[in-house]
From Swiss-Prot:
Pfam families: Lipoprotein_3 (PF00938). This is Uncharacterized lipoprotein MG440 homolog 1. It comes from Mycoplasma pneumoniae (strain ATCC 29342 / M129 / Subtype 1). One of its GO terms (cellular component) is plasma membrane. A lipid is attached at residue 26 (S-diacylglycerol cysteine). Its main location: membrane. It is found in: Cell membrane. It is a lipid-anchor. Residues 1-25 form the signal peptide. Keywords: Cell membrane, Lipoprotein, Membrane, Palmitate, Signal. Belongs to the MG439/MG440 family. The keyword Signal applies. A lipid is attached at residue 26 (N-palmitoyl cysteine). InterPro entries: Lipoprotein_3 (IPR001595).
Length: 277
């Protein structure tokens, strides 16, 4: 083998190592060593658009941060959730460009957790598709405002997150009666008014699940998600006479006023993206 060939292989190897080192350096972010605030993420996102343009890059970076400081990183993820709902008020009005980048095309506030929609209230999970559709037509709570978002987090085994939504909407007596006839109930609880307004407070309380606690395995590039596992208690409090009648009628919604849902996963990645875009 001549000297030129040896030099070429050596030079190529050195160049490969140099490029590899440079790539590794570019892939490291300041916040990964000790993530403690949402502003650290925002600062890095302003310096490197890959964090907001490539979800897998963001997931990898946050996973490394979690491995170095699980408590601090989890608190930041939860803070991003709170910021998106409480400060940015995405249930009331979304920035359309940011929302598509964070949640994906074809998504709506039905995909926000929590919400007063069919998905947020777990109507399908509780009653099935057909009944859920009937309830949706009977009770439409389409105006939502987050009034309280409290986070108490010590570890994945010890946390409480409570979110209170005020929801307003409308009902149509004909649709309510249609639902009640489906379940064999005949009464006149709503009086003679054909339609009217509704208002309720919805209280979502998230606590640790019995198993599958939040860990680095929940940072999933395949599904592009960071799933935070919880048990959910959902309570509805009627703020007007009609809503109170509906919630107090076990025949109408099978005690919808207070329901427990185990093993509920909240994908925190869209809220992180929305809060740093």
């Amino acid at each position: 083998m001549n000297k030129k060939s040896i030099w070429s292989k050596t030079a190529f190897g050195s160049l490969f190592l140099l490029l590899g080192t440079a790539f590794t350096a570019c892939s490291n972010y300041d916040f990964q060593a000790n993530l403690t605030s949402l502003n650290q993420l925002r600062t890095s996102a302003n310096k490197d658009i890959n964090l907001t343009q490539d979800k897998n890059t963001l997931i990898d970076a946050l996973k490394t941060a979690f491995e170095n400081n699980s408590e601090g990183t989890t608190k930041v993820l939860l803070d991003a959730w709170k910021f998106s709902l409480y400060d940015a008020k995405i249930l009331e009005k979304q920035d359309p460009v940011k929302f598509v980048k964070a949640f994906g095309s074809g998504k709506s506030k039905e995909d926000i957790e929590p919400s007063a929609g069919v998905r947020g209230l777990r109507f399908v999970e509780r009653f099935g598709d057909n009944t859920a559709s009937l309830i949706k037509n009977a009770i439409l709570l389409d105006q939502q405002k987050v009034e309280v978002f409290n986070i108490r987090f010590k570890s994945s085994r010890d946390f409480t997150i409570q979110i209170k939504l005020n929801a307003k909407g409308n009902y149509k007596k004909s649709e309510v009666e249609k639902y009640k006839s489906q379940i064999g109930v005949q009464d006149n609880e709503l009086g003679d008014k054909e339609e009217g307004t509704l208002e309720a407070d919805l209280i979502f309380t998230y606590t640790p699940p019995a198993s599958n606690l939040f860990s680095k395995s929940n940072f999933d590039k395949l599904t592009k998600s960071i799933n935070f596992n919880t048990n959910l208690k959902l309570e509805m409090v009627g703020k007007d006479e009609v809503m109170r009648k509906i919630l107090n009628s076990s025949a109408f919604t099978n005690n919808l006023a207070s329901v427990n849902y185990p093993n509920q996963a909240v994908n925190l990645l869209p809220y992180v993206l929305y809060s740093i875009l």
